[in-house]
Amino acid sequence: MTAERIVEGVKESLGIMSDDTDINNQIRGKAIAVMNYINNGGGNITPENATEYEIQAIALGVNDLLNQNGSEFSEGFKAMAAQIQLRGGENDKI
């Protein structure tokens, strides 16, 4: 899986149909930021090993950033991120 597959997965999850370069770049940047946020808390997501669950978590975080819900991520994203972070580098992915 590549970074582009994560971008496409996030766009699909959010219902974004456009293939505009600027939109893709914005989604890519936010997806990388969310992935780094999860990884900095103990997660182990890479474009090569991202599961569907992890892509959905990234999409939820990207949605929060796009909607700028105050200064925090949503409770749903925090719960999904915590599950990924607790699992850490384990190979048994969801």
Predicted stretch roles:
Residues 1-94:
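Divalent metal-cofactor coordination and adjacent catalytic microenvironments
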